[in-house]
């Protein structure tokens, strides 16, 4: 290791909601912290794809827009001044003789740390684009893979293709403001929360199941209508639209982390109840983690992050108490 090289107590890979809250809790445990984020801004997939989505699965918060949640998490994380590195993918992992971990960035940057917490979701995300020659031409015009501003869809005829929780949530959010909303899903059953699906079906949203999006019809600039096809009868229908939203999931890749020697199960990093991985000094939290009865909610990740931090603290200092630290009495927060 080079002389005078700065070594961090914890380096968090991932600057999404879980990474940000984990950084805050590292400060609570007086750990020198760095956060490395692959994207050019903090917030992970919430900032990238769901800034306008209302998040309702956090205790004490009836509902909050994704972008607002990220702003509050950034403010909270900044309490203890963690170092933030953006627009950098971690590609290399090695351990020096003294136990220091060296993380290598995509451009050869070196990051020295005593422990690592993986809060990178399921890896890098790339939307599954609609398989059509015309899709690229209309993307960014009136074909969307995310909803950045709800108001952009006000008084518009909107078709949403997809059946997961995000597609259902978008339908419910847009229904009060759009001229019309139709949801096209290739299966009869939806993957969203039961209450959200019920709300959608009881609203004015037109639900077409089991149908698939087949064709985009338009001119050089915009889609004018879409053709949908019944998956069983092959019956087709053209629907006139102003805006098309496609939510067909993501391509997810753990990338180079798969080569680090981590135990992987179902595309995630296997963890014990202390959020420890099989590699000493490496911990995991949020969607990146796999263990039995894992709860895939932001609220669950907000518990796993502090658990990983406490385990990292105990790894660095076996005499340290492996317990929750109450922010109520923390000297840096008590006068806020």
Predicted feature residues:
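FAD-site-proximal beta/loop scaffold in flavoenzymes
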Residues: 131-152, 243-299, 303, 307-314
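Conserved N-terminal glycine-rich FAD pyrophosphate-binding loop of Rossmann-like flavoproteins
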Residues: 40-64, 193-196, 201
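A Rossmann-like FAD-binding core segment of flavoenzymes
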Residues: 6, 74-105, 110-113, 175-271, ...
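FAD-binding core/adjacent interface of flavoenzyme oxidoreductases
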Residues: 1-13, 28-29, 41, 83-156, ...
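Rossmann-like NAD(P)H-binding beta-loop-alpha module
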Residues: 154-177
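N-terminal Rossmann-like FAD-binding beta1-loop-alpha1 element of flavoenzymes
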Residues: 8-34, 170-175
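Glycine-rich FAD pyrophosphate-binding loop
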Residues: 28-47, 182-191
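Residue-level detector of alpha-helix initiation sites
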Residues: 12, 16-18, 41, 124, ...
